């Protein structure tokens, strides 16, 4: 967007000082651009507004509103929403109150901006989700000279109902949106979302899957679909991203070595790393299907007497007390073992060289004689501390409460038994570079894995499989995710390119689990050379999802919004 619009493109957002410290660069001297003049005008009106650059790719200009300073206005804002739109805001939680304050700041800013600039050229405001759009309906009602485009990346009711109602898609046409909103106590959110969709000049959503929800819950079919993309950075040579895979796989192997090898060992050269990640929505994100398929995969591999091992990482966010002490200790002892072995290696190497250079015969020296008693004793003690009779933990943290993932693993006996070919590592915290277990950021972790697994039941788009594709990692998705549905529309040979789509629309849960287990088993049986070739093929299609190519969908939406604003 910055490439196309330059100085005429800027973003509006809430101001959070802690985040702004590392992601925001203020412009201290306000420029004379329409955005800068509008900031000055809002400050004169008494609002606390920050203006500067967002420190991401493209470095777009951004206007940030300090919603915390606006709380004295909350009652008036709620009264006006009821008077003008009949939006009920009684007893709303603080997060909703913050969105109402932010929405009002956006309304005030855009009204002032239109007065300043709309006479000279077309102005389009692109709203993403209901959290930004509580003021949209009033902008339309007041006939502010701005084209209004509203994009929903999911629906509030869809997310709640898909998680709690069986056969959500079969029952979708028959839901009463208002009744369901009251049932889940999200009347304010659902009403803002619905009115924003109806009052925008253009409504878009991220997939055909979500478009069907919009018709039922928002009372309007989207004018067009605007697929999500990423800023794709391609390497000049194929071997570069393959080398990164090897580099980060070795880091993951360090964790696996420390986590599993105190109990038992397996061949790391014949080990594959699968992962799934996302917010904790047990059925929506397909964790239930993933675990069921893994249990079946484990049975298939054991029955086939395979010497391959699959380590499955489940990365999500759940409340926990701390990392399990035993898991941390294993990692610490591994570091101690490595340090001891490195010291012995250095000592033996130096003494072997001197003994060989000074020797008069051609006999191989006894290497044991080159190791000091201190290092022998230290190695022996470290090994004794290292080894254990306990099974490797299948969850890395001490959870506040047990959850569906833990319960399934216990019931299915998928608890890292030595004979099992599928090992589970449930990591209930998002991965970052400060993580003591991996020392990788999320993108590096993804590159080090062999397969991403995301057979979602409710996923309006699905960034996680897309993040795999742009990093050259094969992925599993579903036809109920926006990404999977889009892939099936634009590509015939997607499976050959490393994108596996599970049929969840017309299959039962059991049938989908069988299909997924077969896909995973087929992947495990692939030769290393075939996996390398597949990584090349999946990385080659990443340009399809670059914003450079997908921005045109938003360009079309904005052009249409401006035409409708001034017919």
Predicted regions and their residues:
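Catalytic cores of nucleotide-sugar-dependent glycosyltransferases that transfer UDP/GDP/TDP-activated
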Residues: 2-567
